[in-house]
């Protein structure tokens, strides 16, 4: 007979008597922190201030001054004296 078979034929031993399992104390209930104070609202923003309206745009510089139309010189009306030799 092998050693293992001999081992198996031994009568079973009763299981050891375990001591009763001592449960740990239940956790104390979580202590809630003080409730948060309500969020403090920031001061309301002042209404957006509109920028001053722009001044009227400058009139475009009048570079193109209207010159009086060039007139041909008035024809001489003065009669030239006849040439004297």
From Swiss-Prot:
Keyword Ribonucleoprotein: no
Tissue expression summary: Expressed in uterus.
Pfam families in the record: SPRR2
InterPro entries named among the record's database cross-references: SPRR2
Stretches forming Sequence repeats: 21-29, 30-38, 39-47, 48-56
Region of interest (Disordered), residue spans: 1-20, 57-85
Family: Belongs to the cornifin (SPRR) family.
Function: Cross-linked envelope protein of keratinocytes. It is a keratinocyte protein that first appears in the cell cytosol, but ultimately becomes cross-linked to membrane proteins by transglutaminase. All that results in the formation of an insoluble envelope beneath the plasma membrane.
Protein name: Small proline-rich protein 2D
Organism of derivation: Mus musculus
Lineage of source species: Eukaryota, Metazoa, Chordata, Craniata, Vertebrata
């Amino acid at each position: 007979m092998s050693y293992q078979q001999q081992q198996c034929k031994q009568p079973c031993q009763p299981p050891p008597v375990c001591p009763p399992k001592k449960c740990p104390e239940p956790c104390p209930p979580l202590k809630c922190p003080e409730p948060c104070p309500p969020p403090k609202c920031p001061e309301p923003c002042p209404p957006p201030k509109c920028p001053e309206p722009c001044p009227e745009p400058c009139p475009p510089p009048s570079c193109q001054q209207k010159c009086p139309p060039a007139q041909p010189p008035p024809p001489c009306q003065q009669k030239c004296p006849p040439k004297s030799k």
